[in-house]
């Protein structure tokens, strides 16, 4: 059981969430004013507490993904993945060669400040990262099978509000049935 963190921009909120019995938290950088510095501090505390932290970056691009991974975030919830090509680009940014094209930064939070042989670090990092692609448009669902088959995309989910908006059902009685239908397609 987890929750989204959207308004409380202090790492200490993680201690409260864990004390409340939650198993993980998601930080929303797409629709909230979190700075990279705050998220990096949250990542450090989450690692110290052994409390899984998921981050939704503002965009699923190399810049944001690299910065979050280098800060020690292992679970990404990537928004607006509409095509298999986008999914492949996201997956490539998240993993080192030979599985991807992630840039190498040798020592920091992402290595837990442990120096080890590069091949060992790369294999460990590739195994730890978990990438969820958010499907938020009709076009994404038209490419569902292609997106789902991209190596390195570990899970799929919907972005319910954006999807409802794209389908033209946001705020109408048709919203819930339309979203339920799209959720079933992911199972």
What are these regions (language model features)?
Residues 1-187:
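Expand to "…catalyze enediolate/carbanion chemistry for C-C bond making/breaking, isomerization
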């Amino acid at each position: 059981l987890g929750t989204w963190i959207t308004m409380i921009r202090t790492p200490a909120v993680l201690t409260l969430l864990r004390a409340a019995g939650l198993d993980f938290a998601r930080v929303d950088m797409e629709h909230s004013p979190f700075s990279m510095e705050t998220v990096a501090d949250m990542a450090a505390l989450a690692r110290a507490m052994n409390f899984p932290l998921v981050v939704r970056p503002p965009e699923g691009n190399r810049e944001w993904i690299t910065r979050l991974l280098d800060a020690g975030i292992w679970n990404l919830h990537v928004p607006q993945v509409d095509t298999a090509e986008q999914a492949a680009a996201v997956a490539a940014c998240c993993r080192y060669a030979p599985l991807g094209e992630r840039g190498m930064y040798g020592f920091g939070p992402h290595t837990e400040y442990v120096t080890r042989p590069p091949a060992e670090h790369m294999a460990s990092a590739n195994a730890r990262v978990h990438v969820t692609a958010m499907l938020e448009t009709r076009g994404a669902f038209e490419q569902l099978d292609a997106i789902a088959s991209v190596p390195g995309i570990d899970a799929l989910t919907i972005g319910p509000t954006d999807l409802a908006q794209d389908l033209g059902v946001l705020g109408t009685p048709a919203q819930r049935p339309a979203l339920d239908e799209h959720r079933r397609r992911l199972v």
